[in-house]
Amino acid sequence: MFVKTGDKVKVIAGKDKGKEGTVLSVNVKKNRVVVKGVNKIKKHQKPSQTNANGGVVESEGSIHASNVKVISKKEDK
């Protein structure tokens, strides 16, 4: 896949078109990537022992790899 974790990318299609961020994770089998600050989804959490209050948790969802363009590669040491 042309995108690796840590690369800086720009979204070229979809509702978040024009936004930039770094790649947090890559799913090669499904050809999807998770970009920091892009495609925010809200998940309703039920109260549990670890999270007593519950509530709404916001996190990044995945987007298809064809909808992003690499701006700069992660520098390898």
Curated annotation (Swiss-Prot):
Disulfide bonds: none annotated. GO terms for biological process: translation. One of two assembly initiator proteins, it binds directly to the 5'-end of the 23S rRNA, where it nucleates assembly of the 50S subunit. One of its GO terms (molecular function) is rRNA binding. It holds the Pfam family KOW. PANTHER family: MITOCHONDRIAL RIBOSOMAL PROTEIN L24. Signal peptide: none annotated. SUPFAM superfamilies: Translation proteins SH3-like domain. Belongs to the universal ribosomal protein uL24 family. The keyword rRNA-binding applies. This is Large ribosomal subunit protein uL24.
